[in-house]
């Protein structure tokens, strides 16, 4: 029975990714890139500035008597900053996809898959800009924080409440359940290989820690992410840079191999070119989530004076995830010279790093995947919770969702790798299609906001948005 279900999942996943998703994803990314006049390249400097030097947003700047995203604790005002929203999204992005996903793409699609991951990031960051800007535009005011995401711009922007519910359900299934089972599965495999710990035992520990964090709400999620994500990223990057530096003479050959394999310039690669493209884009999307509709859930929470600010920051997150972290994993695997067909997933990354730094490689990757994947579990959980609240904002509903997430974390620890990935691939495909339709239809609004932002910057102002600038939809913009 399980084998039959697994075969159905694999066949469905192959069909969606071979004939539908890749074409739609790339076409939309190119469309947004042209529509925004290459915003992801023109404003890289502004992205970095916004992240490193966030504006101090005052109530007057956003035209409110008080910031509705603020939380009064002991008389003090708190809010979710742009940086915290960035790292909550990055916590979800930087996870299994960066270590295990890259390895899977290379083992199945060859080194050329890395090139197509880069292509998706470079073009897809425009999609990330559009979706996160729209999420900021249509965000809502809660009792303790702003909230929003694709479900909200589908309902209030398109006037399609049913589409918002469909997206919310897919979001809950994809991030709360499917992705978290993959993250759990990868952690358990890594720790079994490194320390001999049984997956079921590790699953229990992982589930307990997940419950501890998620019952603390968005502010605990944001605090955890803003503490853990920068540290783990820096540590991993330092090791990766060290490995690449040690093998610097091999780097030109690796880059040539990636490009040759990407376009089938040699006989061996030519026969599997389609697989190379599919694996690169599939695993690239799993990792950077550009256009998938996930990061907007975090982007909507931030307190900013203009929607474009969070759109730019989330576009930077795509670059950080794929061009930096994923590339590091790819270079570690390819410069090591290990047989990429001998193992799969996280075990390939472990084998490559062990080859380079010795026996400490296995436990190092196990610890890093714990931090990467566990931070993703927490970020994924929050995305799902936002959409649970969209469907029915009740304490019971959120409580049941939290228990269901914990159950899927435990389930992921003991199911097969193929089953976990196939399930995630299908739900990811459906979710992405739903979101892309919405942001294509609403993209002109994001472009208008970008033009307004640029005009204010030219005038030497700190860009501030007011719904009076968009009178046709002003009644839909609750937070502005």
Q: Which residue stretches match the model-derived regions?
A:
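N-terminal alpha-helical transmembrane segments of multi-pass membrane transport
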Residues: 1-89, 96, 107-112, 441-480
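Transmembrane helix-loop junctions in multi-pass membrane proteins
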Residues: 4-5, 35-40, 97-102, 176-187, ...
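Extracellular loop-to-transmembrane helix junctions
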Residues: 13-53, 105-144, 320-326, 362, ...
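Transmembrane alpha-helical segments of multi-pass small-molecule transport proteins
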Residues: 22-27, 164-172, 193-218, 235, ...
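Membrane-interface loop-to-helix entry segments
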Residues: 24-31, 36-48, 185-191, 198-247, ...
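Helix-loop-helix module between adjacent transmembrane segments
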Residues: 32-33, 120-144, 150-151, 155-185, ...
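Alpha-helical membrane segments and immediately flanking helix-loop junctions
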Residues: 61-106, 134-137, 143-151, 155, ...
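Extracellular/periplasmic helix-exit of transmembrane alpha-helices
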Residues: 129-139, 143, 239-257, 265, ...
């Amino acid at each position: 029975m399980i084998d039959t279900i697994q075969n159905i999942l694999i066949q469905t996943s192959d069909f969606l990714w071979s004939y539908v998703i890749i074409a739609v994803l790339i076409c939309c990314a190119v469309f947004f890139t042209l529509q925004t006049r290459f915003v992801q390249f023109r404003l890289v400097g502004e992205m970095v500035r916004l992240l490193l030097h966030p504006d101090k947003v005052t109530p007057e700047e956003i035209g409110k008597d008080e910031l509705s995203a603020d939380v009064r604790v002991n008389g003090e005002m708190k809010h979710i900053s742009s940086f915290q929203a960035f790292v909550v999204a990055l916590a979800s992005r930087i996870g299994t996809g960066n270590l295990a996903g890259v390895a899977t793409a290379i083992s199945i699609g060859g080194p050329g898959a890395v090139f197509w991951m880069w292509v998706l990031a470079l073009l897809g960051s425009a999609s990330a800009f559009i979706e996160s800007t729209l999420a900021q535009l249509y965000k809502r005011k809660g009792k303790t924080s702003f909230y929003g995401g694709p479900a909200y711009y589908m309902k209030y922007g398109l006037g399609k409440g049913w589409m918002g519910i469909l997206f919310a359900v897919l979001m809950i299934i994809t991030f709360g359940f499917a992705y978290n089972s993959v993250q759990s599965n990868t952690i358990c495999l890594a720790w079994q290989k490194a320390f001999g710990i049984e997956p079921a035992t590790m699953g229990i520990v992982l589930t307990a820690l997940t419950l501890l964090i998620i019952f603390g709400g968005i502010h605990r999620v944001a605090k955890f992410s803003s503490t853990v994500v920068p540290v783990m990223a820096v540590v991993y990057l330092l090791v990766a840079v060290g490995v690449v530096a040690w093998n610097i003479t091999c780097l030109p050959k690796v880059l040539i191999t990636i490009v040759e394999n990407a376009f089938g310039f040699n006989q061996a690669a030519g026969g599997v070119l389609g697989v190379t493209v599919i694996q690169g884009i599939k695993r690239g999307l799993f990792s950077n989530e550009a256009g998938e509709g996930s990061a907007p859930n975090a982007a909507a929470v931030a307190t900013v004076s203009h929607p474009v600010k969070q759109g730019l920051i989330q576009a930077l997150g795509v670059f950080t995830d794929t061009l930096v972290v994923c590339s590091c994993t790819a270079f570690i695997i390819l410069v090591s010279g290990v047989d990429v067909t001998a193992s799969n997933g996280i075990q390939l990354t472990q084998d490559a790093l062990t080859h380079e730094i010795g026996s400490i490689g296995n436990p190092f990757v196990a610890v890093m995947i714990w931090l990467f994947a566990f931070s993703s579990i927490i970020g994924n959980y929050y995305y799902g919770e936002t959409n649970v609240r969209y469907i029915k904002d009740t304490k019971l509903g959120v409580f049941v969702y939290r228990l269901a997430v914990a159950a899927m974390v435990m389930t992921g620890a003991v199911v097969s790798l193929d089953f976990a990935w196939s399930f995630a691939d299908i739900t990811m495909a459906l979710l992405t299609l739903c979101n892309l339709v919405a942001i294509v239809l609403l993209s002109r609004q994001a472009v208008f906001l970008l033009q307004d932002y640029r005009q204010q910057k030219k005038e030497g102002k700190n860009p501030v948005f007011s719904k009076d600038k968009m009178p046709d939809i002003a009644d839909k913009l609750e937070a502005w």
